[in-house]
Design a protein with these regions (language model features):
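Bacterial N-terminal signal peptides that target proteins for export
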Residues: 2-13
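A structural "domain/chain start" motif
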Residues: 3, 24-68, 72, 79, ...
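Bacterial N-terminal signal peptides
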Residues: 12-25
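Surface-exposed short loop/turn segments
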Residues: 34, 76-81, 88-133, 141-152, ...
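Second-shell loop/turn segments in exported
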Residues: 52-59, 148-156
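Compositionally biased, intrinsically disordered linkers/stalks adjacent to structured regions
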Residues: 154-177
Length: 177
């Protein structure tokens, strides 16, 4: 009799554990520290084309700097495989603006500060959810002292602007903030 009760107890514990495991598997909560809202069961790749520099003022390393920074952003903050073409998510575009503008005038009637602006046009295609496709223009600027040569501050300012634009693109495409 004791053996029969022991078997029922073990059977009951096994059944309860199986039921709990099934219930918890069905009710999963997904959380990402990067803020992405990617369904990795459906979306596995992102293609990021080179962004050619079509701006009037051309800084030759800019195209490569931006394209690589955007790829690096997706590599570091998602589990997506970054490929050159035909991804589940696809980013294409071009650098449409790279310009300097005097910002403020000093007492000697010369520019005291200069604004450097970077503008990039992006076309996003989501082959899994086409209703999320968009085309959008992104822009960032940095201000520097007009006494400085652009060649002395250009790479530092570009790194800041590229990171800002890459963050905006990332948020609009996979984080949806």
């Amino acid at each position: 009799m004791a053996l029969m009760n022991k078997k029922r107890l073990l059977y009951g514990i096994f059944l309860t554990a199986l039921l709990c495991t099934t219930a918890f598997k069905a009710c999963t909560i997904s959380y990402s520290f990067t803020g992405t809202s990617i369904d990795y069961t459906r979306i596995r790749t992102v293609s990021i084309a080179d962004f050619p520099n079509m701006a009037e003022f051309v800084y030759s390393p800019l195209s490569n700097m931006f394209s690589e920074a955007l790829r690096d952003k997706f590599l570091r903050q998602t589990r997506l495989e970054v490929i050159r073409a035909d991804g589940d998510l696809d980013l294409q575009g071009e650098i449409t603006g790279y310009e300097m503008m005097p910002l403020s005038i000093g007492p000697d009637a010369l520019a005291a500060q200069t604004r450097l602006t970077l503008t990039i046009n992006v076309r996003f295609t989501n082959r899994v959810n086409p209703e999320e496709d968009f085309e959008k223009r992104y822009s960032a600027f940095q201000v520097f002292d007009a006494n400085q040569l652009l060649s002395d501050v250009q790479d530092t300012l570009l790194d800041i602007m590229i990171e800002e634009i890459a963050d905006q693109i990332f948020n609009d495409t996979v984080a949806r903030w």
